[in-house]
Amino acid sequence: MEYGHHARPDSKRPLDEGSPAAAGLTSKKANEALTRNRELTTVLVKNLPKSYNQNKVYKYFKHCGPIIHVDVADSLKKNFRFARIEFARYDGALAAITKTHKVVGQNEIIVSHLTECTLWMTNFPPSYTQRNIRDLLQDINVVALSIRLPSLRFNTSRRFAYIDVTSKEDARYCVEKLNGLKIEGYTLVTKVSNPLEKSKRTDSATLEGREIMIRNLSTELLDENLLRESFEGFGSIEKINIPAGQKEHSFNNCCAFMVFENKDSAERALQMNRSLLGNREISVSLADKKPFLERNEVKRLLASRNSKELETLICLFPLSDKVSPSLICQFLQEEIHINEKDIRKILLVSDFNGAIIIFRDSKFAAKMLMILNGSQFQGKVIRSGTINDMKRYYNNQQNHSMKHVKPSCINMMEKGPNLQVKKKIPDKQEQMSNDDFRKMFLGE
């Protein structure tokens, strides 16, 4: 459960720039990014009564300071509860710790900083949900306080989780038992989270500026040896990636990605921009992130007027931005009993809180359109329809939420005088007498 908070403006007078205090403040701000982390602002509460839910925990600790998030979990024997409370500021966490040994109900609670208790887990099966991860820890008798999955809004391939457990010992035990565990052909990676020991990202070449994207290639130019010969003069090439499916669909504007061993080589290769390769003028630029192609395909489909293409796809909506294509595929196979061969592709449409599912043919898509509408997915009713249906639903939801926004004080003040004038109009009208009514109805 998340709670909003408002920062209190600083009312103190500004320090002189040359003063020692100002120098210390500058140093503190410079290091703020390093020191601002959940471990400083998050506390663990042990031995809460079984009746305590998120709301009760929030009410009990809200006087300590603004609260961002509260999680509650049962102990293994279910005889008491844990709570994880994330405050907006460090002083809120300090105030909460002063409540340790207080009696809540009939239980004496223990409050402490939640440090070195966060796990980083990755490479679990794509179909895994929070429940699967929670069950995984429960199987080794460890309580998961909270499980945080990444948003897939801009990158649908992200697959990791941050998991808070109740002690350092449990965190180390999880690493011992789960790191390297084989699950459905995937080797699980589990580590104690440490911001100072970040693993190298899979898209590091893109972020380091060592990867280029070559556009406007013909299908004949989609040859790794040809591309290597054309670009190896600029520096050592680490690898070349040619996205699949371009030759099969006879795209007129194909592309390829090339990773150099260093940034300077990639920048020199930009000289090839707008040069001729074969009989085509190619475009060369530093590569965008990997989701570039997928987002481009989504944009193309959203604007498409090709009726034959549109007849083979349906949209599912509304969906959370943490739902992956793998989870949707699993749902279609296990709950709707669709054969994986009948699904050509699943694309997330984060701009409209939905997904596009492309099927093998239009008849099958029409059948699925009727079957999937109103079905249950992750405890919620979802709709199915065309791209226009998804857009219309999203826009209606946006308009509906706008209607429920309370008018501001300024708007009320502006409308006030007009309302008063309208109320005075009836008072100015003269009341009709009996003679007036006789003339109106009897014509006298």
From Swiss-Prot:
The protein's name in its UniProt record: U4/U6 snRNA-associated-splicing factor PRP24
Free-text function comment from the UniProt entry: Functions as a recycling factor of the spliceosome, a machinery that forms on each precursor-messenger RNA (pre-mRNA) and catalyzes the removal of introns. Chaperones the re-annealing of U4 and U6 snRNAs (small nuclear RNAs) released from previous rounds of splicing, an initial step in reforming the U4/U6-U5 tri-snRNP (small nuclear ribonucleoprotein) that can reassemble into another spliceosome complex; this step involves binding U6 and facilitating the unwinding of the U6 internal stem loop, followed by base-pairing of U6 to U4.
Domain RRM: 41-116, 117-195, 210-289
PROSITE patterns: RRM
Pfam families according to UniProt: Lsm_interact, RRM_1, RRM_occluded
Lineage, broadest ranks: Eukaryota, Fungi, Dikarya, Ascomycota, Saccharomycotina
Species of the source: Saccharomyces cerevisiae (strain ATCC 204508 / S288c)
Other known facts: Present with 672 molecules/cell in log phase SD medium.
An MF annotation (GO) of this entry: U6 snRNA binding
Subunit record text: Monomer. Interacts with U6 snRNA SNR6 and the LSM2-8 complex (small nuclear RNA); to chaperone formation of the U4/U6-U5 tri-snRNP (small nuclear ribonucleoprotein) assembly, the protein is displaced from the U4/U6 snRNP once pairing is complete.
Sites of Phosphoserine modification: S19
Record-level GO BP terms: mRNA splicing, via spliceosome; spliceosomal complex assembly; spliceosomal tri-snRNP complex assembly
Family matches, as SUPFAM superfamilies: RNA-binding domain, RBD
Subcellular location field: Nucleus
Region (Disordered): 1-29
Main location: nucleus
Basic and acidic residues: compositionally biased ranges: 1-16
GO cellular component: nucleus; ribonucleoprotein complex; spliceosomal complex; U6 snRNP
InterPro entries with a match to the protein in the record: LSM_interact (IPR008669), Nucleotide-bd_a/b_plait_sf (IPR012677), Prp24_RRM1 (IPR034397), Prp24_RRM2 (IPR034398), Prp24_RRM3 (IPR034540), RBD_domain_sf (IPR035979), RRM_dom (IPR000504), RRM_occluded (IPR031766)
Keyword terms: mRNA processing, mRNA splicing, Nucleus, Phosphoprotein, Repeat, RNA-binding
